[in-house]
Amino acid sequence: MTDIVVAIDGPAGTGKSSVSRGLARELGARYLDTGAMYRMMTLAVLRAGIDPADAAAIGESVWKVQMLSDHDRYFLGGEDVSSEIRTEEVTQAVSAVSAIPAVRVRLVDLQRQMAEGRGSVVVEGRDIGTVVLPDAPVKIFLTASPETRARRRNDQNVASGSADDYDRVLAEVRRRDHLDSTRAVSPLYVAQDAMIVDTSKMAEAEVIAHLMDLVKQRSGAVW
């Protein structure tokens, strides 16, 4: 099988993570969640007591942060923080930290190192096809209505035991959309050569099967 790089972008709540994992499994490829890397950086900032809006202080510390991704487990300075990076505190701060130029420079460099020249890989995030891997042969942009994404996130929160409110989650989804699409560095937008997939009315298995078809069409490879 020919090695293939698949870049998957889209806003929060479109099913990027679960679909990307499933696609990687079907392809026999590695999976890289770049959003988790921004969450690790955000956690490091919060632990250091730095204001998430203090670009100067964060810029000075960003190169000292040591992080590792291994089979969907995430390590910060050798500590497994896979659960902690998904807390509400990190979620509230991650867009602000991600918008800081020094953070993006550092993490884009790490992401390219992790993705390139190491076999087939599915990389998911918000600027993979436009900034991190602009030459990726397969680019996919997942989308869904804000209401659908808020409902999914709310259901996840309730299922995990953290009571939530749909209206609050919807407001947070819209807030993050605005921050992600208007930030000065690497804003979220659809790459010109990306294939757009609306997941609003699709089950996870349907999305994965559809993406497999798109990968085959775009790459010409056979699995």
From Swiss-Prot:
InterPro entries: Cytidylate_kin (IPR003136), Cytidylate_kinase_dom (IPR011994), P-loop_NTPase (IPR027417)
Binding annotation for ATP: G10, P11, A12, G13, T14, G15, K16, S17, S18
Key words, A-Z: ATP-binding, Cytoplasm, Kinase, Nucleotide-binding, Transferase
Enzyme class: transferase
Annotated EC: 2.7.4.25
Reaction catalysed by this enzyme: CMP + ATP = CDP + ADP; dCMP + ATP = dCDP + ADP
Coiled coil: none
A Gene Ontology term for the protein's cellular component: cytosol
Gene3D superfamilies cross-referenced by the UniProt entry: P-loop containing nucleotide triphosphate hydrolases
Domain of life: Bacteria
Localisation per UniProt entry: Cytoplasm
One of the GO biological process terms: nucleobase-containing small molecule interconversion
A GO molecular-function annotation: CMP kinase activity
PANTHER family xref list: CYTIDYLATE KINASE, CYTIDYLATE KINASE/PANTOATE-BETA-ALANINE LIGASE
Family: Belongs to the cytidylate kinase family. Type 1 subfamily.
Official protein name in the record: Cytidylate kinase
